[in-house]
């Protein structure tokens, strides 16, 4: 991690919601989802918040050797966003505790605030992390 990654870092990230990021597309094999409204799925919104945070911190990491993984999501989802709307995420790094980063997040779709909350990420060494995943897979196959 570079010294530039510190509390107070702010960022903004925008994304135009396509049809394939709506609830029916979240788990196509789940018939229940197929009957639900065509609005941004909460699962995709969480992924969008993760993407915004990754995009904000990557210039402050030794990318791609250093990467980050999500370890906590505490977000509400208070308004529906139809396809074609642009979601804008505004965030601030509120804590840097070793390799653990905490973000304050707010998202809106140009009409409503759709989310507010916090997200935490942990900075990892990608090679070491991938090795531990490989070892875990080997345990299940043994």
What label would you give each PLM region?
Residues 12-18, 76, 120-122:
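Generic structural detector for well-ordered beta-strands
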Residues 2-40:
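Catalytic strand-loop segment that frames the active site of acyl-thioester-processing enzymes
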């Amino acid at each position: 991690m570079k010294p530039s990654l510190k509390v107070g870092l702010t960022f903004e990230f925008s994304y135009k919601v396509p049809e394939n990021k709506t609830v029916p597309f979240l788990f196509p094999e789940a018939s229940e989802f197929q009957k639900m409204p065509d609005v941004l799925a909460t699962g995709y919104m969480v992924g969008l918040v993760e993407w915004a945070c990754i995009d904000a911190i990557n210039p402050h990491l030794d990318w791609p050797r250093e990467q980050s993984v999500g370890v906590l999501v505490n977000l509400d989802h208070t308004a529906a966003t139809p396809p074609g709307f642009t979601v804008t995420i505004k965030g601030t790094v509120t804590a840097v505790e070793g390799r653990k980063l905490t973000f304050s997040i707010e998202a809106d779709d140009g009409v409503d605030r759709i989310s507010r909350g916090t997200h935490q990420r942990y900075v990892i060494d990608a090679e070491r992390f991938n090795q531990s995943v490989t070892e875990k897979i080997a345990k299940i196959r043994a």
